[in-house]
């Protein structure tokens, strides 16, 4: 099913490309927040199991994907700004659920800390409150390559680290995507990494402790960058936190293989629809089409 697309102006400053996958029978709308260099295409597999149950909203950040031509992109934007964009889109689409992937979790949690009245539940995938040695090494290497605008090294870094468990087909498209971005996108990622490195435990405690809605944190068993164990530290900050580990999966969980995709679908729907009837089961079928292949990001 093709989505309805639109360019939405936010705060008179940003123009955001959105995709709306409508379901006439759905009673709720879920908005998905991708990573820093990812686009709406990164959620191609996720939409397959969500759209039979929900209205689904995807969007590109102002500096990325199909939003990029509609914005000047002279100055990097902060995660706080991304959180404000998300809050506005939640209102525009009347979303009740938000779900993020990897570093999209920062903007999502910052937005949830504002206690948006519409949101009833949230899911955060492949994210942790702790920057462990593996993640720090990845980020510092990324800073060097981004500062030099070394496209080949940036593409290789993603595939060799957080993307190590992706199928080869996805790795090829991943490399093509990450190594062919505009320079302002690399500058944006460099800015975001520096933001992330300045975060500390106190910042998380102060910002996120007020979140009171039920939340599910999902991480891959094999992910050494945002580990399931470290993600559980959110339980000390967020009262309604639940946790689920996707077996035999790395950072990109549901796009890595069929079993991980099914586990992610089952855990997500069990959390969002605890009284649901037997869900529809779409088919996991990686697409050999660049437009629909999930794309990684340097810090996703």
UniProtKB/Swiss-Prot annotation:
Its EC number is 2.4.1.-. Keywords: Transferase. Signal peptide: none annotated. GO terms for molecular function: pimelyl-[acyl-carrier protein] methyl ester esterase activity; transferase activity. Pfam families: Abhydrolase_1. Pathway: Polyester biosynthesis; polyhydroxyalkanoate biosynthesis. GO terms for biological process: biotin biosynthetic process. It is an enzyme of class 2 (transferase). Residues 29-253 form the AB hydrolase-1 domain. InterPro entries: AB_hydrolase_1, AB_hydrolase_fold, Carboxylesterase_BioH. PANTHER family: HYDROLASE ALPHA/BETA FOLD FAMILY, PIMELOYL-[ACYL-CARRIER PROTEIN] METHYL ESTER ESTERASE. Catalyzes the transfer of the acyl moiety from in vitro synthesized 3-hydroxydecanoyl-CoA to acyl carrier protein. This is (R)-3-hydroxydecanoyl-ACP:CoA transacylase.
């Amino acid at each position: 099913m093709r989505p309805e697309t639109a360019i939405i102006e936010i705060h008179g400053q940003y123009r955001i490309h959105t995709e709306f996958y409508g379901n006439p029978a759905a009673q709720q709308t879920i908005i998905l927040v991708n990573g820093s260099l990812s686009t709406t295409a990164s959620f191609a597999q996720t939409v397959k199991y969500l759209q039979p149950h929900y209205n689904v909203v995807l969007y590109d950040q102002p500096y990325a994907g199909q939003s990029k031509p509609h914005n000047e992109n002279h100055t990097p934007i902060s995660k706080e700004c991304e959180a404000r964009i998300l809050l506005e889109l939640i209102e525009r689409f009347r979303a009740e659920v938000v779900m993020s992937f990897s570093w999209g979790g920062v903007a999502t949690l910052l937005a949830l800390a504002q206690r948006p009245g519409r949101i009833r539940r949230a899911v955060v995938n492949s994210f942790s409150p702790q920057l462990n040695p593996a993640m720090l090494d990845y980020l510092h290497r990324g800073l060097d390559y981004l500062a030099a605008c070394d496209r080949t090294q940036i593409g290789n870094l993603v595939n060799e680290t957080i993307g190590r468990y992706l199928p080869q087909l996805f790795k090829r498209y991943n490399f093509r995507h990450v190594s062919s971005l505009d320079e302002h996108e690399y500058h944006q990622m460099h800015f975001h990494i520096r933001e992330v490195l300045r975060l500390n435990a106190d910042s998380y405690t102060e910002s996120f402790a007020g979140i009171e809605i039920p939340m599910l944190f999902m991480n891959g068993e094999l992910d050494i960058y945002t580990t399931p164990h470290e993600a559980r530290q959110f339980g000390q900050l967020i009262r309604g936190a639940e946790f689920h580990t996707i077996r035999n999966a790395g950072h990109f969980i549901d796009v890595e293989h069929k079993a991980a995709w099914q586990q992610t679908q089952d855990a997500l729907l069990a959390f969002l629809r605890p009284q649901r009837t037997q869900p529809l089961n779409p088919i996991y079928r990686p697409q050999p089409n660049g437009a629909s292949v999930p794309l990684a990001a340097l810090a996703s």
